[in-house]
């Protein structure tokens, strides 16, 4: 499965304390194929991110992922923290937001 492959690649390339990957494809209208993984949310906690800004953190992750087949992936939402930042957040995960296109489509269908 693609999610497990992504997790293993990231764990191999980055010293990860915690990782969680969500398939959020069903929250979006990107693909009519319900089996396609198009949108991901990834929470990564690593002290490799110490003294690195958000852009550098994302570059580290995308560099690690560039070897993976990601033709079907349209969007990746990244939450990157050091271990201390993650503790300060009290290990809180953020709720996902439905795609605006999906909201519009549902509104039009109901009205």
From Swiss-Prot:
InterPro entries: BolA, BolA-like_sf, BolA/IbaG_stress_morph_reg. It comes from the Bacteria. SUPFAM superfamilies: BolA-like. PANTHER family: BOLA TRANSCRIPTION REGULATOR, BOLA-LIKE PROTEIN 1. Belongs to the BolA/IbaG family. This is Uncharacterized protein BUsg_457. It comes from Buchnera aphidicola subsp. Schizaphis graminum (strain Sg).
